[in-house]
Regions:
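Conserved alpha-helical scaffold segments that buttress catalytic/binding sites
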Residues: 1-136, 163-167
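Rossmann-like dinucleotide/flavin-binding elements
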Residues: 144
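C-terminal active-site-proximal or functional interface alpha/beta core segments in diverse enzymes
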Residues: 150-172
Length: 172
């Protein structure tokens, strides 16, 4: 991984809130204990790629360093925030030097390809929590990456919220 080589980092936290399970990242790093993965997505029983079940927690030395939180179709901000608190609990005792936040916006209500019903408040909440955690645990190092989102208005609104939070000095 580029960030490891370039900046001599050992442990990285990757948080993915795209509606689709991040199967490419998950399965590439399934055996890697130095990439902690937390992924909230629509249940794979209802949405492509059909992966990301709670029982998938990593393998070998990486067992327990991966967290999949599939949500039922129709999940709202309340469901998202409840799941996100599980991420907070999951990473509480872990050490990492960088957070990578994949902030796909296809979980927002009105997306034509998914069945989740979040508002931009979910993105804002996730960004606030990760921003605070980055300053507490990884020297403020956090990267926000775009992801899926097939309603352009939702996409712009959600990503704007993330940028606003990351640019602020408020760590609530």
């Amino acid at each position: 991984m580029y960030a490891r080589r370039k900046y001599d980092l050992k442990k990285i936290l990757y948080v993915d809130i795209d509606a689709h399970h991040g199967d490419g990242v998950f399965y590439e790093f399934e055996h890697d204990p130095d990439l902690i993965i937390a992924d909230i997505h629509e249940d794979g029983s209802f949405l492509y790629p059909g992966t990301g079940f709670e029982s998938e927690t990593g393998s070998g030395a990486a067992k327990g360093t991966k967290l999949n939180l599939p949500l039922s179709p129709g999940a709202t901000d309340r469901d998202f925030i409840s799941a996100f608190t599980k991420i907070e609990d999951f990473i509480e005792s872990m050490k990492f030097e960088l957070i990578i936040f994949q902030c796909g916006a296809d979980g927002l209500s009105g997306d034509p390809l998914t069945h989740l019903k979040y508002s931009d408040k979910s993105h804002e909440y996730a960004a606030q929590v990760l921003h605070r955690i980055a300053h507490e645990k990884s020297g403020g190092r956090i990267i926000g990456l775009g992801g899926g989102g097939y309603n352009t208005e939702n996409l712009a609104t959600a990503w704007n919220k993330v940028v606003e939070v990351f640019a602020s000095e408020n760590l609530t």
